[in-house]
UniProtKB/Swiss-Prot annotation:
Keywords: Cytoplasm, Hydrolase, Nucleotide metabolism. The record marks 10, 66, 148 as: Important for substrate specificity. GO terms for cellular component: cytoplasm. It comes from Thermococcus onnurineus (strain NA1). This is dTTP/UTP pyrophosphatase.
């Protein structure tokens, strides 16, 4: 049994494009983490999520966590509209990194990794930022935007895996294929 340890509808949708038979069991892990380097931060949270769900239900478990970072700071999910505004203003006109750490526990062994994608935002006016915030879209997303939704308008270019920016890099699908899971 393949288990996705995530409540994210975006991760569920991407995995479902390539693998049909899996179960969703969200983890009960807090997303609080004292680590400050994006790769180690995302990997640690992915491992915690995968281990917690594996200990509850067994099977092959996928845990993932995505971190948006700029200037050495990790931007989590905004806690308020004002925080979303500050994040989007910080990203405006600049390049940032999106790092997704993943952990797959298969037959008791862990396979983990991290994927990094660079994203360049266009210059954003305050009017556009507030219009986007009023849609509600940024409030449950790291870095306060969703590239797959209205937030995609802000992106000038990306360097790397688009699906990583959404939160589920295709490297995970390839790892599952290597572990014997049927893809497509």
């Amino acid at each position: 049994m393949l288990v996705l340890a995530s409540a994210s509808p975006r991760r569920r949708e991407i995995l479902g494009r390539f693998i049909k038979d899996f179960k969703v069991v969200p983890s009960n892990v807090s997303e609080e983490c004292s680590l400050t380097e994006p790769r180690t931060y995302a990997l640690e949270l992915a491992r915690r999520k995968a281990r917690e769900v594996y200990n509850r239900v067994g099977g092959t478990v996928i845990g993932a966590d995505t971190a948006v970072s700029i200037d050495g700071h990790i931007l989590g999910k905004p806690g308020s509209e004002e925080e979303a505004y500050r994040m989007l203003k910080l990203l405006s006109g600049r390049v940032h990194r999106v790092t997704t750490g993943y952990c797959i526990i298969h037959e008791g062994e862990e396979v983990s990794g991290a994927v990094v994608t660079e994203v360049k935002f266009r210059e954003l006016s305050d009017e556009l930022i507030w219009a986007y915030i009023r849609t509600g879209e940024p409030m449950d997303k790291a870095g306060a935007y969703g590239i797959q939704g209205k937030g995609g308008l802000f992106v000038e270019w990306i360097n790397g895996d688009y699906y990583n920016v959404v939160g589920f890099p295709l490297e995970i699908v390839w790892k599952l294929r290597e572990l014997g899971f049927g893809v497509m």
